[in-house]
Amino acid sequence: GGSCGQCRVKVKSGGGDILPTELDHISKGEAREGERLSCQVSVKVDMDIELPEEIFGVKKWECEVISNDNKATFIKELKMAIPNGEVVPFRAGGYIQIEAPAHHVKYSDYDIPEEYRGDWQHFGFFDVESKVDEDTIRAYSMANCPEEAGIIMLNVRIATPPPRDLSLPAGKMSSYIFSLKAGDKVTISGPFGEFFAKETDNEMVFVGGGAGMAPMRSHIFDQLNRLDTKRKVSFWYGARSKREMFYVEDFDMLAKENENFEWHVALSDPQPEDNWEGYTGFIHNVILENYLGNHEAPEDCEY
């Protein structure tokens, strides 16, 4: 507990002192105002707490899997249909919680395209099994934007055991999600979120890598397609090799159609067959060396 920082409440009385596990997510100023992580607060006396207003708009839906396709070696795009007549009123940058029942999943049963199977075989991942005896809930950011209605789309990276010790447990939820097929039913709840764009004219700089693509795509599509923003927007994305890049055509099209948008990719381990002539290295270093380091006012940007 205390690792995701998503269960913030304001404790007005009765919560005791803030714990060290909470300080990675709550500043000293916020702590003085009573901000706490509810999962870390022991209820020993009567308490007075204040919950975020959006919590009371949370609902559950039983969705149906439309598709569950690999977008990279270890990342799937899970696309689910919302029940007819229903709406998940989320904002770009928001997230839902997804539920997994107790399950026994064999990685050898996964539908992994041939182009990605080499790494799975190399690391021995097809020998892995995930056995979970209880219901599990995890949070994932939406990759679709609100305008892409009727669906919930997630980018999920599988949490495999480390190759050096495949006897260690695999990620409970990601192992389950990778087993889903079209037509399967999945229960979600939401919407939740705090990672929302501010209503300013400031430049927007998006930085992400891997499955961190999801909220970036949601925000950027929302800004450019729905809001038709005139703010300067750039996206800096990190991937291991060219094979791990996805949504390339989408972002190329956005850059072509919007003169205020540009996007850049850095590969940390480009392969010879990639014939890569773009940025190399880790994306946080690349953006510092090639953009923010020479930016006239990086502190004014919205990240």
UniProtKB/Swiss-Prot annotation:
One of its GO terms (cellular component) is plasma membrane. Keywords: 2Fe-2S, Cell inner membrane, Cell membrane, FAD, Flavoprotein, Ion transport, Iron, Iron-sulfur, Membrane, Metal-binding, NAD, Sodium, Sodium transport, Translocase, Transport, Ubiquinone. Residues 58-198 form the FAD-binding FR-type domain. Its EC number is 7.2.1.1. GO terms for molecular function: 2 iron, 2 sulfur cluster binding; metal ion binding; oxidoreductase activity, acting on NAD(P)H, quinone or similar compound as acceptor. InterPro entries: 2Fe-2S_ferredoxin-like_sf, 2Fe-2S_ferredoxin-type, Beta-grasp_dom_sf, Cbr1-like_FAD-bd_dom, FAD-bd_FR_type, FNR_nucleotide-bd, NqrF, OxRdtase_FAD/NAD-bd. [2Fe-2S] cluster binds at residues 4, 7, 39. Residues 201-303 are annotated as: Catalytic. It catalyses: a ubiquinone + n Na(+)(in) + NADH + H(+) = a ubiquinol + n Na(+)(out) + NAD(+). Residues 1-55 form the 2Fe-2S ferredoxin-type domain. It is found in: Cell inner membrane. Gene3D superfamilies: 3.10.20.30, Nucleotide-binding domain of ferredoxin-NADP reductase (FNR) module (3.40.50.80), Translation factors (2.40.30.10). Binds 1 [2Fe-2S] cluster. One of its GO terms (biological process) is sodium ion transport. PANTHER family: NA(+)-TRANSLOCATING NADH-QUINONE REDUCTASE SUBUNIT, NAD(P)H-FLAVIN REDUCTASE. NQR complex catalyzes the reduction of ubiquinone-1 to ubiquinol by two successive reactions, coupled with the transport of Na(+) ions from the cytoplasm to the periplasm. The first step is catalyzed by NqrF, which accepts electrons from NADH and reduces ubiquinone-1 to ubisemiquinone by a one-electron transfer pathway. Composed of six subunits; NqrA, NqrB, NqrC, NqrD, NqrE and NqrF. This is Na(+)-translocating NADH-quinone reductase subunit F. The gene is nqrF.
